[in-house]
Every structure is written in C-alpha cells, then in structure tokens.
Amino acid sequence: MGLMWGLFSVIIASAAQLSLGYAASHLPPMTQFWDFIAAFFAFGPGARMLVVGLVGYLLSVFCWYKALHQLALSKAYALLSMSYVLVWIASMVLPGWEGTFSLKALLGVACIMSGLMLIFLPTTKQRY
C-alpha cells in the first residue's frame, strides 16, 4: 500500500511540475508584479495551470505523507527520482513542450532506473 501512495505522489508531482512549467511560460514574470497580479486575476490558462500545479503539489504531499507511514524512507525517497524521468518523457511527448532527446539525458534516465531497480529488488537474508 505504501508503494501505491508513493507512486501516486510521484505521478501527481510530475503533473504538477508540468502544470507549473506551463504557467511560468504563460504568465508575466514575478518581477513585473502588477502585470502578474492582473494576469492571475484574469484567470486565463496560465493562472488556471498555476492553481492546478499548486493544488497538485498539495495532493502529492498528502500522498507522500501516507507513503512514509507504510514504506521505508530509503525506498520512498528513491521513488521521487521517477518524477525526473516522467517529466523528461512528458516534455518530449506532449505538444508544445519542445523537450529534446539526448544520449546524455538517456544515460541519466538509465542510471535512475538502475538505481531504483537495485533499491527495490528483493533481498535474500544470509544466515551466518
């Protein structure tokens, strides 16, 4: 059950990250405070995605809290690295994100996946 909560947290956090990325590209920068406030209260697509992203992070924290009660911290924390993989893949697949493929990034994803496999593989207990 803890693994399920952890995976929910990763998926929701990844979607929230993509939502906030969309919002950042469609809202004025915070350095232009009044323009940002005006755009936010106009509640256009950028503002809606900002709210969706923030609510997503809140839901992700709830799932993370539940996961930590049922899963070892070493395993739960390792799951968070999956978010990097999901966001990278989504940025290449989703239209308008212009994510780029590179062998260096693929090598990083392979390292993340290898590490997760090592952490989550069942261990055999040795008797001495």
Curated annotation (Swiss-Prot):
MF-aspect GO terms: carbohydrate derivative transmembrane transporter activity
Example of a GO cellular component annotation carried by this entry: plasma membrane
Compartment(s) where it occurs, according to its Swiss-Prot or TrEMBL record: Cell inner membrane
Pathway as given in its UniProt record: Bacterial outer membrane biogenesis; lipopolysaccharide biosynthesis
Signal peptide region: none
Record topological domains on the Cytoplasmic side: 57-76, 122-128
Main location: membrane
Membrane topology: Multi-pass membrane protein
Stretches in topological domain Periplasmic: 22-35, 98-100
Cell membrane in keyword set: yes
Functional summary from the UniProt entry: Translocates 4-amino-4-deoxy-L-arabinose-phosphoundecaprenol (alpha-L-Ara4N-phosphoundecaprenol) from the cytoplasmic to the periplasmic side of the inner membrane.
Quaternary state and interactors: Heterodimer of ArnE and ArnF.
Family: Belongs to the ArnF family.
Protein name: Probable 4-amino-4-deoxy-L-arabinose-phosphoundecaprenol flippase subunit ArnF
Gene source species: Escherichia fergusonii (strain ATCC 35469 / DSM 13698 / CCUG 18766 / IAM 14443 / JCM 21226 / LMG 7866 / NBRC 102419 / NCTC 12128 / CDC 0568-73)
Taxonomic lineage: Bacteria, Pseudomonadati, Pseudomonadota, Gammaproteobacteria, Enterobacterales
